[in-house]
């Protein structure tokens, strides 16, 4: 027996696009999610039981996508000021917990680091806030001369997100903000270094279009051409 379902969805198109499926076929199951005029889900399967399982999985993903969408509507990204020092320090230590090789553990050095980032390129230093609460920072230095590229690049010295807000698009929004700033400054290359043991971060950057380059003393250089 074949079961066919056509379901019109009342979801924002942005959410639909994040879930879009184009002609998925596997083990007698066909799924299409089209986001053109009205989001519509098409499912063909062999039984009511498998249809229920597919719908359960789909709505679980839809709810997660809606959560991200609603969060994105509430966040703002602005330039960092000197008044953000305490929030930076608190979030910095929280975000790097478990990655002892990759951050300044003493508060005095973390404070110096914040001031150094401000001095390098204040206009490229951003904080993301959700309902007024800082949840992530990115520092993009467009005055940096890369020793390897032999030219000025947009160097992302730092990016971190509150662990409680990871997986919700905040990191992507911060990287996109840095890239937007880099383009404004006329840079064609965005460069960053990430610890070779930080596999999650490496995969995150790769999904955003960064390419793996050389490894130097335990740090992997990654590059995105814009």
Swiss-Prot record:
Keyword Transferase: yes
EC number: 2.3.1.-
PROSITE patterns in UniProt: GNAT
Every N-acetyltransferase domain range: 75-226
One Gene Ontology molecular-function label: acyltransferase activity, transferring groups other than amino-acyl groups
Keyword terms, alphabetized: Acyltransferase, Transferase
UniProt similarity note: Belongs to the acetyltransferase family.
NCBIfam families named among the record's database cross-references: PRK14887.1
Record's protein name: Uncharacterized N-acetyltransferase MJ1207
Organism: Methanocaldococcus jannaschii (strain ATCC 43067 / DSM 2661 / JAL-1 / JCM 10045 / NBRC 100440)
